[in-house]
């Protein structure tokens, strides 16, 4: 699917802004304000300092047990940082798509799970994230664009192309993993955790969830017609794809997981599972997270990991209260050294085993 370079030059492209004004009838001042608001939602995300990271969410903590190679691959005009985790004798490979506000390293526990169970893994940082190029993350369709290019890179790579491919994504990575099924027919299985259905309509749906139905503007005076036009210019035909269309376009096994108390991607509003009645295929397995697994991120982890995460946050908060100030880097690092990183990031074994079983049954 074709891409464009609007992510690089739209800020200074008066012709594009003029086209939006002509098409929408909006005043230039309104367009500039709306654009600034939109762009503020999608900044660049840098990797946090390791002393602020709890859990095995940094490669330095697992490198003795998990081999990987790094490389760059193109996504339109951008170079994305890719990571390959080999597994001896593996004939299958899982492509892992990270969530927003995160990067590839934040899914190392899941990468390790697949590698230790016989799969090679390909992961990458999305545009505007961690080690990849890009001044911003651009929009909600970005992970789909990046995954499309990642799969094209794999298809044309002499060594990577020999693997049977599987997809695993979380949140906006789950949206990408399911939506891309419309474009790539060599995928053998797909698992999406807490995915939303459409990157194109998500902002509108979030606005409707909190402010009710509206005709002309989003919350904060965000013009709806600007939003539609701007995203169409940024992402072109990618805006026409969504998870339901992707799932309905294939008969490969698909695993959809979502927590009932997900306050990021609402179980009842934006989620793929809320569109269950639109899915015609019988190839979908649903996993509903409840209790400790009901949240957007807690669905990923074991019950004891979730309990330990709460304990660590409580202890950190208490330490800050005792100091009556923000901790210094040295104090934060000292606290971090006493955290059981393995326990903190332990995966939801029930869910991951179900995904693994589904993948293992695929040809």
PLM-predicted stretches and their roles:
Residues 7, 11-74, 83, 313-316, ...:
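An N-terminal hydrophobic leader/cap segment in hydrolases
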Residues 100-113, 126, 268:
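The serine-hydrolase catalytic nucleophile loop
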Residues 111-133:
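Conserved alpha/beta-hydrolase
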Residues 137-158:
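Alpha/beta-hydrolase active-site loop
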Residues 179-236:
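Hydrolase active-site cap/lid region
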Residues 250, 256-258, 262:
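Short beta-strand/loop motif that positions the catalytic acidic residue
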Residues 252, 266-276:
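Short alpha-helix in the alpha/beta-hydrolase fold that links the catalytic acid
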Residues 281-363:
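C-terminal catalytic histidine-bearing segment of alpha/beta-hydrolase fold enzymes
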């Amino acid at each position: 699917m074709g891409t464009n370079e609007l992510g690089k030059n739209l800020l200074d492209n008066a012709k594009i802004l003029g086209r939006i004004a002509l098409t929408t009838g909006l005043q230039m001042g309104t367009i500039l304000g709306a654009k600034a608001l939109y762009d503020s939602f999608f900044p660049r995300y840098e990797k946090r300092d390791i002393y602020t990271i709890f859990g095995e969410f940094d490669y330095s903590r697992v490198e003795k047990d998990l081999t990987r190679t790094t490389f760059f691959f193109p996504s339109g005009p951008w170079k994305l940082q890719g990571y390959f985790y080999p597994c001896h004798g593996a004939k299958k490979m899982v492509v892992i798509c990270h969530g927003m506000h995160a990067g590839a390293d934040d899914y190392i526990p899941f990468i390790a799970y697949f590698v230790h169970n016989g799969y090679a893994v390909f992961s990458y940082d999305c545009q505007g994230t961690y080690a990849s190029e890009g001044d911003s993350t651009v929009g909600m369709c970005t992970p789909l664009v990046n995954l499309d290019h990642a799969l094209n890179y794999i298809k044309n790579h002499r060594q990577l192309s020999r693997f049977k491919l599987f997809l695993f994504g979380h949140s906006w990575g789950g949206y990408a993993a399911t939506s891309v099924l419309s474009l790539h027919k060599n995928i053998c299985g797909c698992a999406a955790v807490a995915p939303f259905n459409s990157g194109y309509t998500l902002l509108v749906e979030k606005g409707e969830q909190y402010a009710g139905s509206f005709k002309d503007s989003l919350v904060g005076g965000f013009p709806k017609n600007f939003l539609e036009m701007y995203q169409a210019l940024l992402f072109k035909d990618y805006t026409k794809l969504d998870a339901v269309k992707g799932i309905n376009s294939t008969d490969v096994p698909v695993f959809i997981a979502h927590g009932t108390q997900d306050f990021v991607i609402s179980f009842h509003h934006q989620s793929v599972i809320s569109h269950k009645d639109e899915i015609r295929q019988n190839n979908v397995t649903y996993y509903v997270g409840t209790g400790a697994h009901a949240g957007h991120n807690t669905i990923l982890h074991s019950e004891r990991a979730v309990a330990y995460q709460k304990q660590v946050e409580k202890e950190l908060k208490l330490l800050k209260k005792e100091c009556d100030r923000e901790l210094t880097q040295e104090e934060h690092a000292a606290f971090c050294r006493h955290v059981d990183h393995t326990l903190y990031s332990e995966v939801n074994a029930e869910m991951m085993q179900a995904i693994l079983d589904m993948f293992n049954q695929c040809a």
